[in-house]
Amino acid sequence: MDEQHQPWPLIFLRPSGARFEISVAAWQTMQGFIQHASNATEAGGVLLGRHLRDGSAIIVDAVTAPMAGDRRARTRFHRAQQRHQAAIDAAWAASEGTRTYLGEWHTHPERIPTPSPVDRADWHRRLLQDRYTAPLFFMIVGTAAVAVWEGHRPDVIVQLAGFIPGA
């Protein structure tokens, strides 16, 4: 593949100045569910990855895709908790404790994605109820853009700035 058509990871800047990076492989999985067709349903899953020890970046190197039991509609996605949790547990075990749950992703049938009231309520619920010690990330994949938010307890949510490497 020539350099001009080389796939790049997606990189977002966190408020701390560190990077939040989506690997090419993870991004390619999500791209397969972009809602270009008028009858396409929302899709989603969990973000899996690693915190670099030096604190310079968090890398999403895998995602779960829609699974049996997920509920999908044109403007709604609800993931089956147990099946995605099994994938989280398997990733953790296979990596000997280095690949972890980082957050959630889903698609929207709009060019520039904006969180719905249902999305925001779900994010706030996760920040209050999920068991975690690091920030959680919430990613929405639109038909022409991607947006990522970083969440901290109890309910602070900030949109991250994105950029394209090599641009």
Write out the residue ranges for each language-model feature.
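Histidine-centered divalent metal-coordination motifs
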Residues: H106-H108
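Conserved beta-strand-loop surface patch within small alpha/beta domains used
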Residues: M1-Y101, E110-A167
